[in-house]
């Protein structure tokens, strides 16, 4: 199993959690028993870019903290399997502000949103209370395993 994050920072904020995100992604892939090579794209963007994406793809004029776009592209050949989950767009300026508002550390806020987004890429959603609770439990389990507490 190989878990890869393709990373691009287009925001003006220095990002210090990529190493942690790689650990998170690897642990999540192990816990969910995903086999083969798996990857996702992670892009940090400005608030302006985030707002444009929200308008274009969600038809809502707001600045999101994170947007997830599932792909589920699977390339399978003899003895090889590559699974591209999709793209995650994070807005660091919004996430930092949110962390302060919620009284969380920036590490906690970034990590929570990253794990939550990966589960969206894997097909989890907030369709009802039961699936919402399951997703929240999975997210918290990953964070607790890495010592990232509220």
Swiss-Prot record:
State a single Pfam family of this protein: YbeY
Tell me the cofactor note: Binds 1 zinc ion.
Its needed co-factors are: Zn(2+)
In its UniProt record, which GO terms are filed under biological process?
A: rRNA processing
Gene Ontology molecular functions: metalloendopeptidase activity; RNA endonuclease activity; zinc ion binding
The lineage's top-level taxon is Bacteria
Residues involved in Zn(2+) binding: 116, 120, 126
The text of the family note is: Belongs to the endoribonuclease YbeY family.
This chain belongs to the protein called Endoribonuclease YbeY
């Amino acid at each position: 199993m190989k878990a890869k994050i393709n990373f691009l920072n287009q925001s003006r904020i220095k990002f210090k959690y990529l190493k942690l995100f790689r650990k998170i992604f690897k642990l999540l892939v192990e816990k969910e028993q995903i086999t083969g090579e798996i990857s996702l794209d992670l892009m940090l963007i400005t608030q302006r870019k985030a707002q444009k994406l929200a308008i274009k793809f969600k038809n809502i004029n707001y600045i999101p903290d994170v947007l997830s776009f599932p792909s589920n592209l699977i390339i399978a050949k003899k003895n090889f399997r590559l699974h591209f989950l999709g793209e995650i767009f994070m807005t660091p300026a919004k996430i930092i502000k949110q962390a302060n508002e919620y009284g969380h550390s920036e590490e906690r806020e970034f990590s929570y949103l990253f794990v939550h987004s990966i589960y969206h890429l894997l097909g989890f959603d907030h369709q009802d209370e039961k699936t919402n609770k399951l997703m929240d439990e999975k997210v918290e389990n990953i964070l607790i395993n890495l010592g990232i507490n509220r």
